[in-house]
């Protein structure tokens, strides 16, 4: 995973990290916390603060075939009601989020959110999406190399899905985005066109 903050100290072993500009590398520098840890902290905070009656679905988006391309079993078939803070359902949701860092980062996969977002927009009960990411997509919606030319088309696509939902008598979806460890212009645009909020998280 990418390191958000380095401690300034060095350890005895070399660990593997990711840099968006140079790819994967190994170093003895000690990382205070990674983007994945910041993302998990933010998501768990969201889960802990949702009302008991909230029905949620959780999914992590990644490259097909990789370990972090998965859904939370409790919401595989339908949204699950969280219940009280000590409920098994809420604790299961937190365990799912924590499981995202269980393996070596090389097995996590890339950033491919389209199928997951489309599935969320097709659920008639969904009214809010919390979309967290620590990187830019590997490919655009058509499978081509991601570029700044995709920013508007992606935001327009989900704005159009919202318009279709309203015309079908469903609620529009508020898409809140959280960018972890970097500024994300395309996520800002995505939220602005779906009445959501964009935030950037740099620490835990």
Positions of the model-derived regions?
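DG-centered beta-turn motif at the end of beta-strands
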Residues: 1, 39, 58-61, 120, ...
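…and closely analogous acidic/polar surface helices at protein-protein or active-site interfaces
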Residues: 2-58, 81-89, 101-111
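VWA/integrin I-like adhesion module and closely mimicked acidic/polar interface patches used
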Residues: 7-10, 103-105, 135-201
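Von Willebrand factor
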Residues: 33, 44, 75-130, 137-139, ...
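Alpha-helix capping and helix-coil boundary motifs
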Residues: 34, 75, 89, 149-154, ...
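Structured segments of extracytoplasmic/periplasmic soluble domains
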Residues: 42-53, 61-64, 96-103, 119-123, ...
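A general structural motif
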Residues: 53, 126, 170-172
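Secretory-pathway/luminal and periplasmic proteins that interact with or process carbohydrate-rich
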Residues: 65-70
